[in-house]
Amino acid sequence: MSELNESTTSKFVTINEKGLSNFRIHLNDAGEGEAVIMLHGGGPGAGGWSNYYRNIGPFVKAGYRVILQDAPGFNKSDTVVMDEQRGLVNARSVKGMMDVLGIEKAHLVGNSMGGAGALNFALEYPERTGKLILMGPGGLGNSLFTAMPMEGIKLLFKLYAEPSLDTLKQMLNVFLFDQSLITDELVQGRWANIQRNPEHLKNFLLSSQKLPLSSWNVSPRMGEIKAKTLVTWGRDDRFVPLDHGLKLVANMPDAQLHVFPRCGHWAQWEHADAFNRLTLDFLANG
């Protein structure tokens, strides 16, 4: 297998879906086999490659075609102001991307906002949904035990409103459990993504003013999702409360939960080796 990098796997597709007319989506595409689509979270500067570069190689080596999507309004994809809840629009973007790429069915891996998109996809397009792997997904309403929004979400919106290296570092400091992993390379890479398209940040805030995070809630429909699902959570997540994982496994017909100790909101990055082993076993045998 040749070495994977962002530039050699990069491509664009143009989709036409409700709310996303003649819309360019950027993705990284590598490998052959069953399709695994990885969906990133919603923080400023997020993108498919930066979210999943520690995962794409092992998945390709295991025999999967791996697609890392830049969600609408993020990184290299077109910018957008959304008039509907973001998880639903993002799900449509995945469906449109699959249509262009000729993919009939895919497994979905979703972190935070990407998890909300994966849940919406499974509800809207069940026949095109393989297995689901969710890491601290959004879109699950209030918590019985934790005041919301949590600290990390407050800092995320502060970064959207006041983008600077200082506000970025404030958010990253609660993003990961092990702060020694917050390297200058991580900070500068994220900051470069933020600076690349400031319209993304403005439009995210405009979208959030139209439809707040509470509008993303798909909890009442969790029982409709029949796909086999692996839910993972960082025990020390300061963005989305751990009890939401219990809500998922209590209400979805075929869901299991794995909690990573000493782990924040980015399990697939902070505990990449363990995450890769767990999720690849689930795809093969779960």
From Swiss-Prot:
MF annotations from Gene Ontology = 2-hydroxy-6-oxonona-2,4,7-trienedioate hydrolase activity; 2-hydroxy-6-oxonona-2,4-dienedioate hydrolase activity
Gene3D superfamilies, per database record: alpha/beta hydrolase
- Which reactions does this protein catalyse? (2Z,4E)-2-hydroxy-6-oxonona-2,4-dienedioate + H2O = (2Z)-2-hydroxypenta-2,4-dienoate + succinate + H(+); (2Z,4E,7E)-2-hydroxy-6-oxonona-2,4,7-trienedioate + H2O = (2Z)-2-hydroxypenta-2,4-dienoate + fumarate + H(+)
Entry keyword annotation includes Methyltransferase? no
The Enzyme Commission number assigned here is: 3.7.1.14
Q: What are the annotated GO cellular component locations?
A: membrane
Q: Which UniProt keywords apply?
A: Aromatic hydrocarbons catabolism, Hydrolase
**Main EC class of this protein?**
hydrolase
Active site positions, chain numbering: H265
Indicate the annotated site residue(s) for Transition state stabilizer.
S112
Per the UniProt record, the site (Catalytic role in ketonization of the dienol substrate (substrate destabilization)) maps to R190
Is Secreted tagged as a keyword? no
Pathway assigned in UniProt: Aromatic compound metabolism; 3-phenylpropanoate degradation
- Residue ranges of every copy of the AB hydrolase-1 domain listed in the record: 36-271
Q: Which GO terms describe its biological process?
A: 3-phenylpropionate catabolic process; biphenyl catabolic process
- The membrane spanning regions, by residue number, are none
Pfam families in the record: Abhydrolase_1 (PF00561)
The function of this protein is: Catalyzes the cleavage of the C5-C6 bond of 2-hydroxy-6-oxononadienedioate, and probably also 2-hydroxy-6-oxononatrienedioate, a dienol ring fission product of the bacterial meta-cleavage pathway for degradation of phenylpropionic acid.
Task: State the family it belongs to.
Answer: Belongs to the AB hydrolase superfamily. BphD family.
Subunit arrangement?
A: Homodimer.
Protein name in the entry: 2-hydroxy-6-oxononadienedioate/2-hydroxy-6-oxononatrienedioate hydrolase
Annotated organism of origin: Comamonas testosteroni
**Taxonomic lineage from the root:** Bacteria, Pseudomonadati, Pseudomonadota, Betaproteobacteria, Burkholderiales
Supply the gene name.
mhpC
